[in-house]
């Protein structure tokens, strides 16, 4: 009994970590799921939510359905994710504004070591795999340099954005939050979380459920049939997002978001020393390095924990 309790506590904590990552534009909760060893279990559990459940229900009842979809695992994990988003949204948003370099440095280190972690999962290292890695990196980088849209937060747009964002959230390397930024829905959705706008939240979650149930089947099938190729492409996605979360940037132009706030539109990456010269602000390179290494240590620790 104690062992089961610890397992569910562990799953809940992994959900908290996934939720925290999903709040940050440029970081994916799917990455956290992968490095903590629950990615395949998550996809398979979601994939089992389909019309075939009717047969399970007729044969085994509701209890059988709950067991078939690994219900306790899903409830515990998503409980952690939603708890994290609800409680950490304000804190992470504040930290990204007030302490951007240390926070982005931590996530840069997290993604960098996660790339190494995922490359280790690839069994057959061929030249063709390298091509898929490059393709994934180009695709992800292309997304990061797209000009953001300015969609109005209508109910239908909120529904569609939920479906799109959740697909990104379960992909290691593609950030659901960043996709929301690209389509101009990040501020409205985060604002709804902060102020608990029930109508917006319910519509967004409905979109998430629709997207999750449909996309998980595709991704699960790809991982079963073409695991190495899929993992290589997903690793490329993570590589392609690294320039986006590089800590030192110069803002070239600004835009006004749907909340009336000035936010960066075009940015270019700088070295820490260029940053100090151009902005006359400290680069905090030593603190940044420490936090990058802390992220590396965290992932290696999670990897060891997942192997137990």
Swiss-Prot record:
Chain ranges passing through the membrane: 15-35, 69-89, 91-111, 130-150, 163-183, 200-220, 228-248, 282-302
Keyword Lipid metabolism applies: no
Record GO biological process: cell wall organization
One Pfam family matching this protein: VCA0040-like
Domain of life of the organism encoding this protein: Bacteria
A GO cellular component annotation in the UniProt record: plasma membrane
Keyword line: Cell inner membrane, Cell membrane, Cell wall biogenesis/degradation, Membrane, Transmembrane, Transmembrane helix, Transport
PANTHER family given in the database record: INTEGRAL MEMBRANE PROTEIN, POLYPRENYL-PHOSPHATE TRANSPORTER
Protein purpose: Flippase that catalyzes the transport of undecaprenyl phosphate (UndP) across the cytoplasmic membrane, from the external side to the cytoplasmic side. Is involved in UndP recycling during peptidoglycan synthesis. Required for cell shape maintenance at alkaline pH and peptidoglycan maintenance. Required by the cholera pathogen for growth and cell shape maintenance in the intestine.
Stated name of the protein: Polyprenyl-phosphate transporter
């Amino acid at each position: 009994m104690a062992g089961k309790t610890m397992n569910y506590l562990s799953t809940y904590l992994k959900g908290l970590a996934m939720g925290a990552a999903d709040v940050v534009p440029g970081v994916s909760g799917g990455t956290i799921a992968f490095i903590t060893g629950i990615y395949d279990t998550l996809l398979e559990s979601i994939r089992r939510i389909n019309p075939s459940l009717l047969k399970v229900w007729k044969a085994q009842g509701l209890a059988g359905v709950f067991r078939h979809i690994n219900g306790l695992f899903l409830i515990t994990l998503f409980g952690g994710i939603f708890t994290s988003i609800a409680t950490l949204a304000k804190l992470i948003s504040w930290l990204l504004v007030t302490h951007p370099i240390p926070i982005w440095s931590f996530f840069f280190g997290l993604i960098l070591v996660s790339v190494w972690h995922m490359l280790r999962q690839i069994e057959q290292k061929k030249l063709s795999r390298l091509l898929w890695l490059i393709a994934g990196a180009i695709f992800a980088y292309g997304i990061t340099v797209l000009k953001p849209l300015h969609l109005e937060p209508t109910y239908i747009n909120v529904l569609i954005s939920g479906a799109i964002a959740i697909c990104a959230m379960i992909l290691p390397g593609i950030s659901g939050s960043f996709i929301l930024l690209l389509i101009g829905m990040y501020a409205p959705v985060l604002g709804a979380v902060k102020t608990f706008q029930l109508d917006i939240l319910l519509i967004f979650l409905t979109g998430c459920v629709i997207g999750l149930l449909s996309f998980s089947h595709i991704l699960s099938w790809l991982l079963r049939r073409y695991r190495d190729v899929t993992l290589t492409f997903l690793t490329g996605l993570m590589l392609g997002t690294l320039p986006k979360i590089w800590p030192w940037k110069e803002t070239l132009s600004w835009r006004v978001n749907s909340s009336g706030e000035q936010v960066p539109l075009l940015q270019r990456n700088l070295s820490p020393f260029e940053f100090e010269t151009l902005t006359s602000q400290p680069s905090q390179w030593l603190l940044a390095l420490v936090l990058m290494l802390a992220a590396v240590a965290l992932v290696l620790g999670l990897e060891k924990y997942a192997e137990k």
